[in-house]
Amino acid sequence: MVAMLLLQAAIYAHPEQLVDTVWVAAHASDAGVRVVDMRQSGYAAGHVPGAVYLSPVAIRDAKAPPTFLPTPAAFEEMMAKLGIADATRVIVYDERGGIYAARLWWILHYFGHDNVALMNGGWTKWAAESRATSTDSPSPPAAKFTARPHPEMVATASDVVASINRPGVKIVDARTAAEIDGRDLRGIKRGGFIESSVPVYWEDLLDPQAKTFKSADEIRKIYQDRGVLPSQQVIAYCQVGMRASVDLFALHLIGYSNLRNYYGAWEEWGNRDDTPIATKK
């Protein structure tokens, strides 16, 4: 019984959301599976065989502040062109530890498509293992994708203001210490952090060498040491919604369920004059 409890504590609550390179190598060409390459560059020079390409900037609508989320119609068209249908198993990877891949993972969940996973370790691990690559660009037949938005997954600035120091809600900051301290503004008008938020830098969730996600126990300890508990609603933020998506992915992976992305993020919060900002004393 003790051994069983230890085993349950060590595994992810949603292991289907994270697949390894061995699985991808064996199933990338399966009917019903679509691998999506979300690297900034390098697709034409070589990618996972069968993978289609989606630019990281394609899923950010510059005309739709403060969230910059694509419209349901635009996202449906985008997925349809990639050959992603309602029943498609989507596997996403990038070369940046998952910040682009996790963003698509989160947006797919937002639009009601839960059958999506990250390739653990991304392109870094695939290349390190000298796995097969291709320079072919697949042209999958257009598919029928239905966007079913879940607005409850997005926290607005007003939601965040109402959540500051609120029992039962924890705000998680996925940014660097320099951003939180206000030393690295990154073009934002004001520096600092949201009062009562706790820092969980997104890269701390990864093995520093392999860039694979840490074990369930390690991830759970990172959050619980900062007072982030499964019973709470968690609102994550960064600067533009990418790094926060990695935190939300990790939390979902270990079984947290009440998760929201403040998608306006520090780009909105730090550029407004009416949002409260805390600074390091």
Which residues does each PLM region occupy?
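Cytosolic catalytic domains that perform sulfur/thiol-centered chemistry
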Residues: L7-K281
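Sec-dependent signal peptide recognition
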Residues: M1-L7
